Amino acid sequence: MAIRRAQTLLCLSKFKTNFVSGSLHRFSSSSQNSNQFQNVGFIGLGNMGFRMVNNLIRAGYKVTVHDINRDVMKMFTEMGVSSRETPYEVAQDSEVVITMLPSSSHVMDVYTGTNGLLLGENDIRPALFIDSSTIDPQTTRKISLAVSNCNLKEKRDNWEKPVMLDAPVSGGVLAAEAGTLTFMVGGPEDAYLAARPILQSMGRTSIYCGGSGNGSAAKICNNLAMAVSMLGTSEALALGQSLGISASTLTEVLNTSSGRCWSSDAYNPVPGVMKGVPSSRDYNGGFASKLMAKDLNLAAASAEEVGHKSPLISKAQEIYKKMCEEGHETKDFSCVFRHFYNGKDEV
């Protein structure tokens, strides 16, 4: 946790100059956006969250933030962004609250814990809550029900009750910074339509997936497919090298044949084959193996909940658990290539 906080602070310190000279200038000089919501609260200022906040400010929203990391909070305050000590205080200043947190337990605590977002359930100011964390659908639905049981302090247009959307993202840190994330959204469709301008300020694509929890379900399924695809691509490339085919040649074959996939043509796991991806920098940056292990655990729990057979989840869990135990938990998940091959790299 301490390492993660230090990494976030380092990213923020590099980001600070551009944030102040760019985002806040654009906010002060640009016309207000046409969305019905203007005051947005944001909780969770990690590697993804602080970049998403920057894009909200670029789009003209007035943002109030909170994080348990006081150093990050201080840095945002110094950049001219309003901060609050508790989630409840953020809610009091916001029409919409977005959360981007590490786990189901964190999300549950921020919503329903001491000084949580839903404190004073008969007097809630935000009409809309958007959770972009990657958590299990069951927890999402529990929190959504708790939100719907609250009452609004002031009714807005056709909003009789506050509403929650689950809107996890795909694209990682680079997409968060560029504002090109993909949002997978579950919840009432009218709330999704109202939230689209906010989502579009942080992402390129938003896909409505159905009722509450379906966004979370889509994210878990997407990451399961991503994990299995990476395992298959890594095993194929490792086998090819062992049989005497260079990884670059086999990659060309895959990418012009039926084996083509995101793991081969956009995120190749073999060092030296592709520039700008984690495998080209000793698997640093990107999506940590421990996070993939967490998401596979969520997929396994969800599969068990509905009685779905999941042999590939189990195998992927086993491999990523081993990778983490061997000290690769903070390395990008494409380092699983090392599980299959330890020969000479192409450089």
Curated annotation (Swiss-Prot):
Catalytic activity: 3-hydroxy-2-methylpropanoate + NAD(+) = 2-methyl-3-oxopropanoate + NADH + H(+)
Residues of the active site: 219
GO CC field: mitochondrion
Keywords: Branched-chain amino acid catabolism, Mitochondrion, NAD, Oxidoreductase, Transit peptide
Class in the EC hierarchy, top level: oxidoreductase
Enzyme Commission numbers on file: 1.1.1.31
Presequence boundaries: 1-34
InterPro entries: 3-OH-isobutyrate_DH-rel_CS (IPR002204), 6-PGluconate_DH-like_C_sf (IPR008927), 6PGD_dom2 (IPR013328), 6PGDH_NADP-bd (IPR006115), HIBADH (IPR011548), HIBADH-like_NADP-bd (IPR029154), HIBADH-related (IPR015815), NAD(P)-bd_dom_sf (IPR036291)
Metabolic or biological pathway: Amino-acid degradation; L-valine degradation
Protein's name in the database: Probable 3-hydroxyisobutyrate dehydrogenase, mitochondrial
Record lineage: Eukaryota, Viridiplantae, Streptophyta, Embryophyta, Tracheophyta
